[in-house]
Amino acid sequence: MIENIKKDAQERMGKCVDATKNQMAKVRTGRAHPSLLDSIQVSYYGTMTPLNQVANVGVEDSRTLSVTVFDRSAIQAVEKAIMSSDLGLNPMSAGATLRIPLPALTEERRKDFIKVVRNEAENGRIAIRNVRRDAISEVKKLEKAKACTEDDVRRSEEEVQKFTDAHIKKIDEILAAKEIELMEV
């Protein structure tokens, strides 16, 4: 029973780390990366469709993305969706392909992005600590129900704390790497 609680806590903590990593990946660095446009929705024949379902996103060079639209009639809808996104990008049309030059980040903008990334990391840490709290309270419920001993509770609390420390360390490593990436000129 306690093993299931610990296993579940470890899985949930892993998911928290993955979610934090995905949130941080959305923060724009100076480099072009196809995942930068993952959050963009295109109005395609009256329905909102993810950009990656109506176009192929690729990297042309370190500062330029290329978007090849599958259906030529949707080029303007894709262009409009990219321009109206909060990424501050201006696509240039070249036939069935849109070229998106990424403007260089200013020092002030980089610092803003670092604040956003640190906030995401803190949210990830909080989520992991919430998982720890839930796991420990589940184990204590078992103790109250006389399903395990006090020693088992203490041992499992220590193990859950080790999982927590390891996962928070992973988030800190991801944060440090992202900060370095953001400060590169």
From Swiss-Prot:
A single GO cellular-component term on record: cytosol
InterPro entries: Ribosome_recyc_fac, Ribosome_recyc_fac_dom, RRF_sf
GO BP annotations listed: cytoplasmic translational termination
Any matching Pfam family: RRF
Protein's UniProt keywords contain Repeat: no
Gene3D superfamilies: 3.30.1360.40, Ribosome-recycling factor
Record keywords: Cytoplasm, Protein biosynthesis
Recorded superkingdom: Bacteria
Signal peptide region: none
Cellular compartment(s): Cytoplasm
A single MF term (Gene Ontology): ribosomal large subunit binding
Keyword Protein biosynthesis: yes
Principal subcellular localization: cytoplasm
HAMAP family: RRF
Function recorded in the entry: Responsible for the release of ribosomes from messenger RNA at the termination of protein biosynthesis. May increase the efficiency of translation by recycling ribosomes from one round of translation to another.
Family: Belongs to the RRF family.
Protein name, UniProt field: Ribosome-recycling factor
Origin species: Shewanella baltica (strain OS155 / ATCC BAA-1091)
This protein's encoding gene: frr
